[in-house]
Amino acid sequence: MAGGRPHLKRSFSIIPCFVFVESVLLGIVILLAYRLEFTDTFPVHTQGFFCYDSTYAKPYPGPEAASRVPPALVYALVTAGPTLTILLGELARAFFPAPPSAVPVIGESTIVSGACCRFSPPVRRLVRFLGVYSFGLFTTTIFANAGQVVTGNPTPHFLSVCRPNYTALGCLPPSPDRPGPDRFVTDQGACAGSPSLVAAARRAFPCKDAALCAYAVTYTAMYVTLVFRVKGSRLVKPSLCLALLCPAFLVGVVRVAEYRNHWSDVLAGFLTGAAIATFLVTCVVHNFQSRPPSGRRLSPWEDLGQAPTMDSPLEKNPRSAGRIRHRHGSPHPSRRTAPAVAT
């Protein structure tokens, strides 16, 4: 800002781009996530299993709504938590600006579109960060559901809901002479249980709840670390970030403890969500920082000119400089002869 007045920038493409490009892309992502989650447009891959495999013989824990961390609670947390954090952070940044002695922050311009629409920097930042977060949230859902549909990896309680007829399948029970499973079943009609429960039990890898929680906490923790400014304390921001990471970890533990997912499913979900959040924060919203008002980027040579420099120790110590000059034959400054003056 110059003279306390904000920079004004006129743009006639911001509203059409938001309506016809970004909103359409977000709608496509939401529609694809809905198709993968609630319809059978993409059938789940039928993966075979070994007879009497103890890996998939855990008891049925009940419907998802009966879990200690039901999906409704997970969806509420991953939606409300980051939204409130970003909203409070942007409001604090707008009403309590950093003091002049703090690290300088590049200011944004106020966009004027047409004769009626004016978008201030706080509004632009809020819409940008929350819009990108929403896009990433549905993208994480797509990645998790696509992985479940393609792999068809059974849950730990798969055999409890599948209820296969081992006699009809020709499976023999384990014995001292044959401790392990003896046959791999690939028949699609091997399960006699409820088709809906069997289909849900084939969607274990990766864990969608773990992916959503990891995405939400990674995005929010990076926002807290990169945007919040706490003066005089080094432990406030790490404490907030660890407090955000704790619920996501507990969600993964509960999924494993209730025999709804394997540890590998939860870890894959954590990696998926964290990777998507890191990519969006780093490459899309540029670490939640504003871009310079001018569109021209510095060349590498100009950028080197702004790099921090280090003074030579010889310039700080004139005695050492004098010794080096004397050693190489240069006369000491005090012993130089004055130039002759013509008479």
Curated annotation (Swiss-Prot):
Annotated membrane topology: Multi-pass membrane protein
The keyword Transmembrane is annotated on this UniProt entry: yes
Keywords, in A-Z order: Glycoprotein, Membrane, Phosphoprotein, Transmembrane, Transmembrane helix
Keyword Phosphoprotein attached: yes
Pfam family, one: PAP2
Cleavable signal peptide: none
GO biological process: phospholipid dephosphorylation; phospholipid metabolic process; signal transduction
One Gene Ontology term, aspect cellular component: plasma membrane
UniProt main location, coarse: membrane
Cellular compartment(s): Membrane
Provenance organism: Homo sapiens
Modified residues (Phosphoserine): S299, S312
SUPFAM superfamilies in the cross-refs: Acid phosphatase/Vanadium-dependent haloperoxidase
The family this protein is said to belong to: Belongs to the PA-phosphatase related phosphoesterase family.
Protein name, per record: Phospholipid phosphatase-related protein type 2
InterPro entries documented for this protein: P_Acid_Pase_2/haloperoxi_sf, P_Acid_Pase_2/haloperoxidase, PA_PP_rel
Transmembrane segments: 12-32, 69-89, 129-149, 210-230, 239-259, 266-286
Region (Disordered): 290-343
UniProt xrefs under SMART domains: acidPPc
Basic residues bias spans: 322-335
GO molecular function: phosphatidate phosphatase activity
Glycosylation sites: N165
